[in-house]
Amino acid sequence: ATYKVTLVTPSGSQVIECGDDEYILDAAEEKGMDLPYSCRAGACSSCAGKVTSGSVDQSDQSFLEDGQMEEGWVLTCIAYPTGDVTIETHKEEELTA
């Protein structure tokens, strides 16, 4: 399945199509978006974002605590969409504050 992923960045929103077997960060890069990342393995906070609607599967991640995921935090480098989803990007500072 393919879902609509709305990425809300500091420079505006962009909607991309992302397959349920494709990491959101990878799909965004294919569309020419410049999103932050570092390890690409779900083990740091560089690519952190916040889900404001919809849901993702990020079971490959090893950095976020359960409580943070319940609050909507997401690591875009290892997150698959499980439906249409809206994510605020560039949130590392807020997560680690």
UniProtKB/Swiss-Prot annotation:
Keywords: 2Fe-2S, Chloroplast, Electron transport, Iron, Iron-sulfur, Metal-binding, Plastid, Transport. One of its GO terms (cellular component) is chloroplast stroma. GO terms for molecular function: 2 iron, 2 sulfur cluster binding; electron transfer activity; metal ion binding. [2Fe-2S] cluster binds at residues 39, 44, 47, 77. Binds 1 [2Fe-2S] cluster. Residues 3-93 form the 2Fe-2S ferredoxin-type domain. Transmembrane segments: none annotated. Pfam families: Fer2. Ferredoxins are iron-sulfur proteins that transfer electrons in a wide variety of metabolic reactions. This is Ferredoxin-2. It comes from Spinacia oleracea (Spinach). The lineage of its organism: Eukaryota, Viridiplantae, Streptophyta, Embryophyta, Tracheophyta.
